[in-house]
UniProtKB/Swiss-Prot annotation:
Keywords: Amino-acid biosynthesis, Branched-chain amino acid biosynthesis, Cytoplasm, Leucine biosynthesis, Magnesium, Manganese, Metal-binding, NAD, Oxidoreductase. This is 3-isopropylmalate dehydrogenase. GO terms for biological process: L-leucine biosynthetic process. It comes from Pichia angusta (Yeast). The keyword Magnesium applies.
Length: 362
């Protein structure tokens, strides 16, 4: 069996973290006999420097033909905020590949990390939810008008019933993967916004008509933001929300485990009902241009690779083995500086790769 994976390392620490994830995937390959065909392409600032665009047609076509895509990080001060920006490569690939659902889990890879949270350990212990963010609609892709000298600019938040139904089905599917099903939360601003009223009505009807075994609890986004810092376990389960709210709430959630270096993400183009959804996987952290070589935490990217195995490559057991290996490595105190350790990027990657090999051979 072989799987085709496109690598988009990106900028600054991106190539470093992708290299460690590949190291772990190669350990999986050796242990279980599956072949990974890696194809590397440029994205972001690296692509701008080479081709003048943040994502080349060649890279996009390669991604379309792959089983999955693993991305590092894009951006940095070098490329500024001009008309051609590294982040445009990300927006383009999400839209072109129809990656409509962004999944960002928030949990503790090991209880050894509880002390790193900016919130009290007793408040965050047991936090375990996933934010399901609609990724190709809403205000980020709506009509916009720049200031043309009249001192007025505008952005349009727009959603259709099919767009909301599609992301609701993704959230419901994920909730049903547990027995009993996980709690389902929908976040909106229905007390003010027309688009949120359509969102709430559509989510409610979709769950009632298609997933009668589930109940959805609606929460205003500002209230949810407060709950997240006061009592995050109250939101345990699956949280579904629109593009902008999802962007903000998942960034807020990302500080709960104490380091962005721990949090993976998946962007999917279809339900992972056969564990073969096409997806793009990336760490939640940015390109960290201020970090020197060997300093970045590779675990978010390694855990993104674990999600890739489980959701896109139909290698669920191998994905779980990576997650267990990460826990074992953290429990052993092998950590980068962001977690209070003294290990280098490569040392953490080596430790996880060795642990994965051990787990899969047993």
């Amino acid at each position: 069996m072989s799987k085709n994976i496109v690598l988009l390392p990106g900028d600054h620490v991106g190539p470093e973290v992708v290299a460690e994830a590949v190291k772990v995937l190669e350990a999986v390959s050796s242990a279980i006999g599956v072949k990974f065909n890696f194809s590397k392409h440029l994205i972001g600032g690296a692509s701008i420097d080479a081709y003048g665009v943040p994502l080349s047609d060649e890279a996009l076509e390669a991604a379309k033909k792959a089983d999955a895509v693993l991305l590092g990080a894009v951006g940095g001060p070098k490329w500024g905020t001009g008309s051609v920006r590294p982040e445009q490569g990300l927006l383009k690939i999400r839209k072109e590949l129809n990656l409509y659902a962004n999944l960002r889990p928030c949990s503790f890879a090991s209880d050894a990390l509880l002390k790193l949270s900016p919130l009290k350990s007793e408040i965050v212990k047991g936090t375990d939810f996933v934010v399901v963010r609609e990724l190709v609609g809403g205000i980020y892709f709506g009509d916009r008008k720049e200031d043309a000298g009249d001192g007025v600019a505008s952005d349009t938040e727009s959603y259709s019933v099919p767009e909301v139904q599609r992301i609701t089905r993704m959230a419901a599917f994920l909730a049903l993967q547990s027995d009993p099903p996980l709690p389902l939360w929908s976040l909106d601003k229905a007390n003010v916004l027309a688009s949120s009223r359509l969102w709430r009505k559509t989510v409610e009807e979709t769950i009632k008509n298609e997933f009668p075994q589930l109940t959805v609890q609606h929460q205003l986004i500002d209230s949810a933001a407060m709950i997240l810092v006061k009592s995050p376990t109250k939101l345990n389960g699956v949280i579904v929300t629109n593009n902008m709210f999802g962007d903000i709430i998942s960034d807020e959630a990302s500080v709960i485990p104490g380091s962005l270096g721990l949090l993976p993400s998946a962007s999917l183009a279809s339900l992972p009902d056969t564990n073969k959804a096409f997806g793009l996987y990336e760490p939640c952290h940015g390109s960290a241009p201020d970090l020197g070589p060997g300093k970045v935490n590779p675990l978010a990217t390694i855990l993104s690779a674990a999600m890739m195995l489980k959701l896109s490559l139909d290698l669920v057991d191998a994905g779980r083995a990576i997650e267990q290996a990460v826990k074992n490595v953290l429990d052993a105190g092998i950590m980068t500086a962001d977690l209070g350790g003294s290990s280098s990027t490569q040392e953490v990657g080596d430790a996880v790769a060795q642990e994965v090999a051990k787990l899969l051979k047993n």
